[in-house]
């Protein structure tokens, strides 16, 4: 519930640009954020395994 409140609060125009914090577009998680994808590490892994992110493959060496 706190995540939804935070997302709603951030939707309003902010007085200062410094207050903006990157959050996952799917679940709203603030930590483990990948800027290239706009997702947190958990959602990125889940979506990559499902094949929803083009060009991302599981590495093996």
Curated annotation (Swiss-Prot):
Alphabetic keyword roster: Metal-binding, Ribonucleoprotein, Ribosomal protein, RNA-binding, rRNA-binding, Zinc
> What's the domain of life for this entry?
Bacteria
Is Metal-binding included in the keywords of this UniProt record?
yes
Q: Report the co-factor binding details.
A: Binds 1 zinc ion per subunit.
Name any one GO molecular function: zinc ion binding
A matching Pfam family: Ribosomal_S14
Positions contributing to Zn(2+) binding: 24, 27, 40, 43
* Biological process terms in GO annotation: translation
The family this protein is said to belong to = Belongs to the universal ribosomal protein uS14 family. Zinc-binding uS14 subfamily.
* HAMAP family from the UniProt entry: Ribosomal_uS14_2_B (MF_01364_B)
* NCBIfam families per record: PRK08061.1 (NF005974)
The subunit field of the Swiss-Prot or TrEMBL record says:
Part of the 30S ribosomal subunit. Contacts proteins S3 and S10.
Q: What is this protein called?
A: Small ribosomal subunit protein uS14
Q: Which gene encodes it?
A: rpsZ
């Amino acid at each position: 519930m706190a995540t939804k409140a935070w997302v709603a609060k951030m939707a309003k125009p902010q007085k200062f640009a410094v207050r903006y914090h990157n959050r996952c577009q799917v679940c709203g998680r603030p930590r483990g954020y990948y800027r290239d994808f706009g997702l947190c590490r958990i959602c990125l892994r889940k979506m990559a395994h499902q094949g929803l992110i083009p060009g991302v493959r599981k590495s093996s060496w």
